[in-house]
Amino acid sequence: MARHLVAAMYLVDDDPVGALAHGRAAKNRAGRIGVVRETLGVLAYRASEWAEALGELRAARRISGGPGLLAMMADCERGLERPQRAIELARGDESQQVTGDDLVELRIVEAGARVDMGQLDGALVTLQDAGLDSSARGEEAARLDYAYAEVLLASERTREAAEWFGHAVAADLGDSTDARSRLAALED
């Protein structure tokens, strides 16, 4: 089982489908271990196998407990074209236990679900309520600024979108987003 997990982690970036096969093999050998189910859920998520990912992430939560994995589960609902369920998950009782970067990620997913449903103003408010701050720095701040810029762009508020892509560039100390190229495209 452990060898399959190691192989999966080795392959996940370059071959998510191959990594998923190793994750499934690990589950076949140790399906009652929470970390195995969580890993398989993440691998299925990375391979865009939304239904499998959602099932495995739910199983991992049943085994291990706690509010973790909600953002990924909500994003799976989006992948399954069920944005209303994603919002319900993001706003449900369990979400009250989510804090910090996990809460920011959950709100980004919720905002995306609202965009999927055409609720652009609701998406903007969701991101504002997540702690949007143009002076914040770090990966989560960059992701939040970037998501906000995306919704502004979808709302045809191009000038404001460019401003927030600029904030994302400033916040993104490790260049984890493509905010710089998005900003350049808007400035052309």
Language model features by range: what are they?
Residues M1-N28, T39, Y45:
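Alpha-helical segment of the N-proximal tetratricopeptide repeat
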Residues R62-P67, S95-Q96, D121, V125-L132, ...:
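TPR/TPR-like (Sel1-like) alpha-helical repeat modules
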Residues V12-D14, A47, L80, M117, ...:
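Structural motif corresponding to the intra-repeat A-B loop/turn of tetratricopeptide repeats
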Residues Y10-L11, L43, A74-C76, A113, ...:
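Residue-level signature for tetratricopeptide repeat
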